[in-house]
Curated annotation (Swiss-Prot):
<dbReference type="GO" id="GO:0009737">
    <property type="term" value="P:response to abscisic acid"/>
</dbReference>
<dbReference type="GO" id="GO:0009570">
    <property type="term" value="C:chloroplast stroma"/>
</dbReference>
<dbReference type="GO" id="GO:0000325">
    <property type="term" value="C:plant-type vacuole"/>
</dbReference>
<comment type="similarity">
    <text>Belongs to the NAD(P)-dependent epimerase/dehydratase family.</text>
</comment>
<dbReference type="InterPro" id="IPR044163">
    <property type="entry name" value="SARED1-like"/>
</dbReference>
<dbReference type="GO" id="GO:0016491">
    <property type="term" value="F:oxidoreductase activity"/>
</dbReference>
<dbReference type="InterPro" id="IPR016040">
    <property type="entry name" value="NAD(P)-bd_dom"/>
</dbReference>
<dbReference type="InterPro" id="IPR036291">
    <property type="entry name" value="NAD(P)-bd_dom_sf"/>
</dbReference>
<dbReference type="GO" id="GO:0005829">
    <property type="term" value="C:cytosol"/>
</dbReference>
<feature type="modified residue" description="N-acetylalanine">
    <location>
        <position position="2"/>
    </location>
</feature>
<dbReference type="GO" id="GO:0005886">
    <property type="term" value="C:plasma membrane"/>
</dbReference>
<dbReference type="Pfam" id="PF13460">
    <property type="entry name" value="NAD_binding_10"/>
</dbReference>
<keyword id="KW-0007">Acetylation</keyword>
<comment type="subunit">
    <text>Homodimer.</text>
</comment>
<dbReference type="GO" id="GO:0048046">
    <property type="term" value="C:apoplast"/>
</dbReference>
<protein>
    <recommendedName>
        <fullName>Uncharacterized protein At5g02240</fullName>
    </recommendedName>
</protein>
Length: 253
């Protein structure tokens, strides 16, 4: 049996990370899966296996064990805003969002991603896939206002660091994430947030996860960055040829 590449997915207990970890495990003829989560609860949530490591991406030393001997990295960590306590929907208005101490986008999406990219370089990783978000071309995007976190600004900074790192990469800037079935839509790639002006600016998490897995399999996905959206289910032929999808992408950032 050939030596299979070992793939580490970070943020493996998150909503999209869980799907990627599961797909890697199911693809055991192609990959050896490893996961990185922040807590023991996160580890239990995805099955508690020995291939799941616990570490804090904002603390470089704590994540090093997970990076030993890996060939590829899929980054699915992200700062997550929490609704400020005390919001009463019956009174109208909008809820306020805050980030917990130590979990601001600057720490998680910039320093945390930089730590992962650096650890991957030391490990000799041959490919890094990162899932980001559409909207990064607009500094005034509403997502940047959440908790005054400037989340897209910091994600973009980490993406630029990755693109400049010398390690082959794929940057997937997903549209609005849907908790819907994967594999039943035509997927669309774009650049510079053009898809945000269309009705194809959302994409199921399961499809984002599949694109992460497929990116590991095709040279055509390397050193490219793209936005990812989808056509509504039932309106066109579901994407099956990922080599062709990646071949449409010409942008390096």
């Amino acid at each position: 049996m050939a030596n299979l590449p070992t793939v580490l997915v970070t943020g493996a207990s998150g909503r999209t990370g869980q799907i990627v970890y599961k797909k890697l495990k199911e693809g055991s003829d192609k990959f050896v899966a490893k996961g990185l989560v922040r807590s023991a609860q996160g580890k239990e949530k995805i099955g508690g296996e020995a291939d799941v490591f616990i570490g804090d991406i904002t603390d470089a030393d704590s994540i090093n064990p997970a990076f030993q001997g890996i060939d590829a990295l899929v980054i699915l960590t992200s700062a997550v805003p929490k609704m400020k306590p005390g919001f009463d929907p019956t009174k109208g208005g909008r809820p306020e969002f805050i980030f917990e101490d130590g979990q601001y986008p600057e720490q998680v999406d910039w320093i945390g991603q930089k730590n992962q990219i650096d650890a991957a370089k030391v490990a000799g990783v041959k490919h890094i896939v990162v899932v980001g978000s559409m909207g990064g071309t607009n500094p005034d995007h509403p997502l940047n206002k959440l908790g005054n976190g400037n989340i897209l600004v910091w994600k973009r900074k980490a993406e630029q660091y990755l693109a400049d790192s010398g390690t082959p990469y794929t940057i997937i800037r997903a549209g609005g994430l849907l908790d819907k079935e994967g594999g039943v839509r035509e997927l669309l790639v774009g650049k510079d947030d053009e898809l945000l002006q269309t009705d194809t600016k959302t994409v199921p998490r399961a499809d984002v996860a599949e694109v992460c897995i497929q990116a590991l399999l095709f040279e055509e996905a390397k050193n490219k960055a793209f936005d990812l959206g989808s056509k509504p289910e039932g309106t066109s032929t579901p994407t099956k040829d990922f080599k062709a999808l990646f071949s449409q992408v010409t942008s390096r950032f």
